[in-house]
Amino acid sequence: MTYLDLRKAFHDPAQDADQLYDRRFNDERTWHLKTSIAGSPAFVYMAPEIYEALLEAAQIDKDILRLEAALPQRALDSYRDSCLIDEIVLTNEIEGVHSTRREIGEVLERLKQNDRRGRFFGIVQKYALLQTRPDIALRTCADVRDVYDDLVLAEVRISDPHNVPDGTYFRTKMVHVINEAGIPIHDGIEPEARIIEEMDQALDVLNDESREPLLRIALFHFLFGYIHPFYDGNGRTNRFISSYLISRQYEPIVGLGISYAVKQEIEKYYKAFSRCEHPLNRGDITPFVIAFSEICVNAMCNLRDALTEKKSQMDMYLHRSAVLVPEPLRTLVESLITATLFTFDGVTAKELCEAERLSRQTLYKRLSELRKLGFLQEEKIGRKVFYKLNEEAFLLRGC
């Protein structure tokens, strides 16, 4: 049964909106927050949809762990990098910031060499850390500002210096939130003293360990968006914090699928915000908690399905390799299969030499043999040549 928001109940002659509000607000399971939304005390009613999302997330997380354990480490590492790149491109895209997979991929490669140059270094570094389950402090306004500074401040300063935060931690002036069509949908809280007060309360919600983690993450995500503490970079900061928290609660790779899932359901995402901010909804944040929890579960489903498909493809390719490829070339073909299924561009000669522990001369000799068999796909991108398995030829060749 779809959760009926109070605004709709108010306009429905068949509903008693006051009675529905009283029942939810006074339910013993309801979580009352120390803040208000559009002038009404904020609360979350523990609807069945929330419990269903929590249970489903726990089950899918186990499925993802099982699939990860069944994949070679090289394949998993490559796929994590690919997910990380996609996540950053999409979180930028949602905010109207243009970036490409290649651009983010190059920053990631430089990061692995301890090279801090380049645009988007901060956001790439932050997301790359998620796979190690770092402990990022999120207890004070200063902590939130530190995340913002590391993540997007440099990019905001380049884009428009006037959007750099001008208060102790946050902005000091009014800001209007607009949707993708450029229509104002929300005014952020002001002045900074109130932003600080509201953010402190939101952080208290986030750190209340008596509550389910996904519930707290969803609530904080809403409250951060409602407060809108910065002039620019709010969405990217908010989604990163959610990704970080989810990567701590579930398998780390799950945190790299949040922006993709939000982008897939962007209308549902924004509509959930607007429903809860409406005065007639009377402070009930439950619709957003349900929507955001479902979006997170969908992110986990997407990941599970992708890993399942890639595991199936890899098993099939390895089986064909055992029949079609001469034994001395099989480990090289396995590396090419991994690059084909789990990366975007493929793999370079340098990476193949390191993975296979081969000299350049031996590698090129074996690549030449695969080329003669028709199993090698090559593409020059910039100065580098990337290699993949020629899937069409490999699949058409009779066993």
Annotated model-derived regions:
Residues 1-399:
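FIC/Doc superfamily catalytic core
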